[in-house]
Amino acid sequence: MVILFDQFNLPEDIYKVIFATEQQEIVGKMLIKYMQDNGSEIGKTEMSVFATRLHDGEAIIKEKGKSPFDKEVKMSYNKRQFYDRILTPMRGMGLIDYDLYKKTYKISDKFNKLMVKVGLMWIREIEKNKKEGAMKQF
């Protein structure tokens, strides 16, 4: 997945940086919240149940409040698109880790480590170009 952002208009919400659409942001937040509610680790079956509930429109975004005007808001998201556009990119970026032996998904801090690594790669590139002299004209 490619993340493009503007340093001067960087959103406060990480999900706005990572995902292209508002619906993807909501589903990504729902997934992380679901995982955190279950000890930051869920099994393959639990992930499938989560995706199926989304697909069937049974996932609740906003629970019904005490006010008569508060409505329970349910959301629907295609199961295949959930795996293609939410889970697979989150695994690829290191936000979620999959343990092949335990067959569990776990919230990971690899994303942070990768962003630090990308920053260090950029600094090395700048230093390399300084040593070689000014960048050659094309």
Question: Which residues does each predicted region cover?
Answer:
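Minor-groove-contacting beta-hairpin "wing" of winged helix-turn-helix DNA-binding domains
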Residues: 102-109
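Short amphipathic alpha-helical interaction segments
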Residues: 73-93
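Short, amphipathic alpha-helical interaction segments positioned at domain boundaries
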Residues: 110-138
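DNA-recognition alpha helix
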Residues: 43-71
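Long, compositionally biased intrinsically disordered regions
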Residues: 35-38, 44-51, 137-138
